[in-house]
């Protein structure tokens, strides 16, 4: 339930809500108003150790529960998530700021991840080859790996945790979850519903906090694997530190997603696609379009329509249904984004839509409106860096080849999109672009949960991505059995 009282957030360890043993807390504001809605503990190492001990004890019995039974338990959780969709979306809008429309979409994508986890009996099946030699059979068996942990960001407080713990738990593991201290309330509700579904205590544990919790997870000898989603510098740190301590790590990192606009595109649908990708969720997502490489032949027409449509977007509190762009997560992030916009102007880019001057319209929240630059080049910080905001850079290119070359020069390689009506162009793009997830006339090429999610280059550190068969492989280990009987 959403209330107006200021909440003191707790940890959930071994099936109980408990106060952190530490004394340090951090205020959690509503990004649309700046008003404090909660205080979250910055838990110390001792809290992580208690959570790991609880998960370790629970693993002894949970790992032996038959796979179909684990799946049936998740069906109960799935039903509760579906029954509480509206409430979950409202919590996301309250603490994250994204519009209720965007939050509702996130809830649905999270539910789809749990749907994947319920299909684990199929996904965990091994392989067998009889008669590999005279009287000898060979087979591969999959087993859970133990206690695993997830470290998740603020921008998708429901979807990303649900990428992790349901699938890991369905595979027979137990879990320690550390969500962003910026969005702790949704995590609380996810855990409440999880135990309402009847799971044994200790199977899922929640430890709120900041970097001390992260370091404790990475260094704890009883945690076998760590899943992470966040910025590139932190992802690199998590990967290097976790692997140094002998852990399996998947670390999904930053992005600078490019869209190539060809002269043969459907102009109206392309403009709406770019707007949806660049400005929905206030641009705070790793699959947002932040650069458009538009071919010269259509550039002026495309930009004119894009600017006109962008100027129609309303900025404000995500609970108001007419608003398209909500607030950024914190005042500090807003100031960082304004710094990038100022940098683009100073570097000589042409500011076509200025999202800085909107305070008189939206009040005291952490708002930056949709912003568009033209005349951007690779020497500018606004092209190089992940801004994580509703800021779009336009680069004019002569043809598809130049657009692909531009895209591949980025240090990131998460997602990339082409807008075209040519199958040949789409094929050339698909075969030559360096990105983990590719879209053809799809504004956000984030795959459904039954496909793997991961980028390339500085967008991903690890081997196996989240979701799909990658996720099952990450959360299990194989045993190869060669046997004969006398």
Swiss-Prot record:
It comes from the Bacteria. Keywords: NAD, Oxidoreductase. InterPro entries: Ald_DH/histidinol_DH (IPR016161), Ald_DH_C (IPR016163), Ald_DH_CS_CYS (IPR016160), Ald_DH_N (IPR016162), Aldehyde_DH_dom (IPR015590), MeMal-semiAld_DH (IPR010061), MSDH_GmP_bac (IPR023510). One of its GO terms (molecular function) is malonate-semialdehyde dehydrogenase (acetylating) activity. The keyword NAD applies. Pfam families: Aldedh. Pathway: Polyol metabolism; myo-inositol degradation into acetyl-CoA; acetyl-CoA from myo-inositol: step 7/7. It catalyses: 3-oxopropanoate + NAD(+) + CoA + H2O = hydrogencarbonate + acetyl-CoA + NADH + H(+); 2-methyl-3-oxopropanoate + NAD(+) + CoA + H2O = propanoyl-CoA + hydrogencarbonate + NADH + H(+). NCBIfam families: MMSDH (TIGR01722). Catalyzes the oxidation of malonate semialdehyde (MSA) and methylmalonate semialdehyde (MMSA) into acetyl-CoA and propanoyl-CoA, respectively. Is involved in a myo-inositol catabolic pathway. Bicarbonate, and not CO2, is the end-product of the enzymatic reaction. PANTHER family: MALONATE-SEMIALDEHYDE DEHYDROGENASE (PTHR43866:SF4). Homotetramer. This is Malonate-semialdehyde dehydrogenase. The gene is iolA.
């Amino acid at each position: 339930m959403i209330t107006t009282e200021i909440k003191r957030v707790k940890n959930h360890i071994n099936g109980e809500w408990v106060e952190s043993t530490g004394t340090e807390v951090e205020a959690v504001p509503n990004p649309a108003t700046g008003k404090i809605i909660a205080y979250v503990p910055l838990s110390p190492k001792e809290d992580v150790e208690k959570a790991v001990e609880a998960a370790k004890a629970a693993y002894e019995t949970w790992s032996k529960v038959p796979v179909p039974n684990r799946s049936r338990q998740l069906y109960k959780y799935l039903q509760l998530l579906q029954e509480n969709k509206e409430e979950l979306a409202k919590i996301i809008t309250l603490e994250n700021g994204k519009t209720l429309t965007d939050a509702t979409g996130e809830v649905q994508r999270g539910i789809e991840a749990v749907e994947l986890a319920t299909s684990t009996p199929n996904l965990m099946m091994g392989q067998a080859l009889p008669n590999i030699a005279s009287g000898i059979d060979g087979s591969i068996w999959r087993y859970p790996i133990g206690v695993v942990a997830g470290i998740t960001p603020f921008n998708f407080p429901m979807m990303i945790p649900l990428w992790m713990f349901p699938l890991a738990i369905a595979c027979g593991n137990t879990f320690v979850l550390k969500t962003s201290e910026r969005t702790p309330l949704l995590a609380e509700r996810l855990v409440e519903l999880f135990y309402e579904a009847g799971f044994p205590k200790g199977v899922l544990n929640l430890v709120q906090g900041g970097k001390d919790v992260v370091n404790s997870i990475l260094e704890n000898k009883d945690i076998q694997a760590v899943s992470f989603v966040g910025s590139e510098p932190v992802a690199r740190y998590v990967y290097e530190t976790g692997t140094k301590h002998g852990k399996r790590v998947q670390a999904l990192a930053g992005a600078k997603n490019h869209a190539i606009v060809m002269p043969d595109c459907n102009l109206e649908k392309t403009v709406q696609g770019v707007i949806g990708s660049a400005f929905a969720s206030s641009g705070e997502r790793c699959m947002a379009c932040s650069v458009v490489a538009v071919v010269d032949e259509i550039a002026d027409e495309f930009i004119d329509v894009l600017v006109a449509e962008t100027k129609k977007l309303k900025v404000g509190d995500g609970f108001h249904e007419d608003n398209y762009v909500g607030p950024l997560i914190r005042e500090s992030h807003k100031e960082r984004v304004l710094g990038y916009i100022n940098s683009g102007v100073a570097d000589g880019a042409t500011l076509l839509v200025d999202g800085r001057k909107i305070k008189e319209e939206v009040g005291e929240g952490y708002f930056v409106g949709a912003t568009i630059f033209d005349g951007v080049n690779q020497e500018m910080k606004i092209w190089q860096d992940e801004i994580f905001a509703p800021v779009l850079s336009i680069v004019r290119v002569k043809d598809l080849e130049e657009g692909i070359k531009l895209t591949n020069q980025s240090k990131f390689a998460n997602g990339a999109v082409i807008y075209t009506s040519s199958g040949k162009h789409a094929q050339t793009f698909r075969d030559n672009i360096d990105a983990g997830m590719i879209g053809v006339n799809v504004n956000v090429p984030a795959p459904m949960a039954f496909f793997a999610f991961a980028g390339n280059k500085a967008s991903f550190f690890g081997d196996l991505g989240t979701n799909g068969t990658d996720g099952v492989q990450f959360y299990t280990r194989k045993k190869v059995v060669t046997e004969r009987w006398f």
